[in-house]
């Protein structure tokens, strides 16, 4: 059939994008472990090429350790650390950076091959170039984040950490969306309000992830370890929430405000997800109804993990599970919005004209 002939070149593209999405999800978890083990400042230089190799000799290890000793984190928090202890945190950060390099090559080399083979249409090619540009920007943002903790601070700036994580998941979401748009699937007739609420859910998920990263960067999860109360009340006093000047700094620097915002956003997101699921089921929206239920279920699990992570003062296992399910929730949100979003023919949008013409002659 012409349609299947035209879609054949996209099979390899689908496998490639699926692998990249999986690698980014793994990268987010390794990054989370790097943060939780306080390993992110163990490498004080940014060497995109030569930094691929770790220290191989005793002299190289000693040099790397001496570099770490020059930053405030070592002097104020880890003075007296042994070389073997340094190696533990070094390997986490090195693995995180290596995985970033692997993702870059795993994306760029097949992408160039697909372009050379003429497998990509203009619209798909432009979208993939944009994703590549975001990936390059992410590398720079990663170093910008690390650099914030090398001179005066003992940790990276929490707002830079939040930007770094959010950008990684924007790239992940863009790849998942692009992958789904490669399939030929009709969009059934559903109420416009379902599309609007799905878009609101996805936007709110990104905002919640950003604030979750602020909580992590400030280590605010190790404070106010009660639920549902926080600082002894359901809603803390305005004097405690907004004492910093200018007022907007509280949104980024005030431990209480940041954690309170993260909680309130969670409640709003969960309530909207439940309403969306009920609405989709009542509208007999088919796959969209199932997607809405799955999203609400995953979000409920995520909320429970968040509560237990807080109550137990952020054990690494629970914290990583909380971060992993956040990626799952985001993916389900992307899938739900894409499922409801209008679409053109996948082949027409993603294949080059030459491939479409060849298929039409078959």
Swiss-Prot record:
Is-annotated flag, keyword Protein biosynthesis? Answer: no
| Compartments (UniProt record) | Cell membrane
Indicate the principal place this protein occupies in or around the cell. membrane
Q: How does it sit in the membrane?
A: Multi-pass membrane protein
What transmembrane ranges does the database entry give?
A: 12-32, 102-122, 128-148, 159-179, 198-218, 264-286, 291-311, 314-334
Query: Which family does the record claim for this protein?
Result: Belongs to the COX15/CtaA family. Type 2 subfamily.
Protein name as it appears in the record: Heme A synthase
Organism field: Rhodopseudomonas palustris (strain BisA53)
Name of the encoding gene: ctaA
């Amino acid at each position: 059939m012409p349609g299947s002939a035209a879609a054949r070149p996209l099979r390899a593209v689908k496998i490639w994008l699926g692998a990249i999405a999986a690698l980014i999800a793994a990268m987010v978890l390794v990054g989370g472990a790097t943060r939780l083990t306080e390993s992110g400042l163990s490498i004080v230089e940014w060497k995109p090429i030569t930094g691929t190799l770790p220290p191989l000799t005793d002299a190289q290890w000693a040099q790397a350790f001496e570099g770490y000793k020059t930053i405030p984190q070592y002097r104020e928090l880890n003075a007296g650390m042994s070389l073997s202890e340094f190696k533990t945190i070094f390997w986490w950060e090195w693995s995180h950076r290596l995985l970033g390099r692997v993702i870059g090559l795993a994306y760029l080399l097949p992408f160039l091959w697909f372009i050379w083979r003429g497998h990509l249409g203009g619209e798909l090619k432009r979208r993939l170039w944009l994703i590549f540009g975001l990936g390059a920007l992410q590398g720079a943002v990663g170093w910008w984040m690390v650099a914030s903790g090398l001179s005066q601070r003992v940790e990276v700036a929490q707002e830079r950490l939040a930007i770094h994580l959010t950008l990684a998941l924007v790239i992940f979401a863009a790849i998942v969306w692009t992958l789904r748009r490669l399939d030929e699937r009709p969009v059934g007739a559903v109420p416009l309000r379902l599309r609007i609420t799905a878009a609101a859910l996805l936007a709110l998920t990104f905002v919640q992830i950003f604030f979750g990263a602020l909580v992590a960067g400030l280590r605010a999860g190790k404070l106010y370890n009660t639920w549902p109360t926080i600082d002894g009340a359901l809603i803390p006093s305005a004097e405690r929430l907004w004492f910093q000047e200018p007022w907007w700094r509280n949104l980024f620097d005030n431990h209480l405000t940041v954690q309170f915002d993260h909680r309130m956003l969670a409640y709003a997101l969960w309530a909207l997800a439940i309403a969306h699921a009920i609405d989709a089921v009542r509208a007999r929206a088919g796959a969209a109804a199932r997607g809405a239920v799955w999203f609400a279920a995953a979000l409920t699990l995520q909320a429970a993990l968040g509560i237990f992570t807080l109550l137990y003062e952020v054990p690494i296992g629970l914290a990583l599970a909380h971060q992993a399910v956040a990626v799952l929730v985001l993916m389900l949100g992307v899938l739900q919005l894409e499922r409801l979003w209008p679409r053109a023919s996948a082949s027409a949008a993603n294949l080059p004209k030459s491939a479409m013409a060849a298929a039409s002659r078959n």
